[in-house]
A protein has these predicted regions:
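Short, acidic, Ser/Thr-enriched surface-loop or helix-capping motifs
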Residues: 130
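Low-complexity, Gly/Ser/Thr/Pro-rich intrinsically disordered linker/tail segments
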Residues: 149-173
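Alpha/beta-hydrolase-fold serine-hydrolase catalytic core, especially in secreted/extracellular enzymes
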Residues: 136
């Protein structure tokens, strides 16, 4: 989190920020809230995780050094879990535009249980909904602008998804 805070601080005067979450399998949910606080001028929530007997909001609070400019997040079919919490929440609160391809749709927190055979069994322990109450599991985060991965362009040195994100920042001033 310290590296992200430093990077955003160094970009305070930038025209915009791009978060490339393609291929990001997720991580610690609280990090999504921490980053959202560095990009927001008011408090809010990226969504809610509901467990059997309780629920947890992915609340964020504005930080003094928060970035005020436009934000674009690039996702793809391999973006999952916490990256979906971050992208979907930022999209729904209107703080970021999402570009790329629909994410994996695997946003449920889970745990592993070791079986007597030594194998591991993974199972979901909660459900996640975006700020507007949309289930991401099995659906994914749907981009505002769908830009498909283009192998031919990539081989010639052009990343069509990144190019689209840059173009959006240049027109969103």
């Amino acid at each position: 989190m310290a590296k992200v805070r430093t990077a955003i601080g160094e970009c305070r005067d930038c025209a915009g920020l791009i978060f490339d979450l393609r291929g990001n399998p997720g991580g610690v949910g609280g990090i999504a809230s921490g980053i959202a606080g560095l990009l927001s001028s008011s408090e809010g929530s990226l969504g809610t995780m509901k467990m059997r007997s309780t629920q947890l909001k992915f609340a964020f609070f504005p930080q003094p050094e928060s970035f005020k400019g436009p934000v674009v997040i690039i996702i793809d079919g391999s973006s999952a879990s916490t990256s979906e919490v971050f992208a979907g929440g930022m999209q729904e609160i209107g703080r970021a535009k999402i570009i790329g391809e629909t994410s994996m749709g695997a946003a449920l927190p889970s745990i592993f249980q070791k079986l007597p055979t030594g194998a591991l069994f993974q199972f979901a322990i909660a459900d996640f909904k975006t700020p507007k109450g949309i289930l991401v599991e099995g659906r994914g985060v749907i981009p505002d602008l769908e830009v498909r991965w283009n192998r031919k362009a990539l081989l010639s040195g052009h990343d069509s998804q990144l190019d689209a994100a840059i173009k959006l920042l240049q027109t969103d001033k």
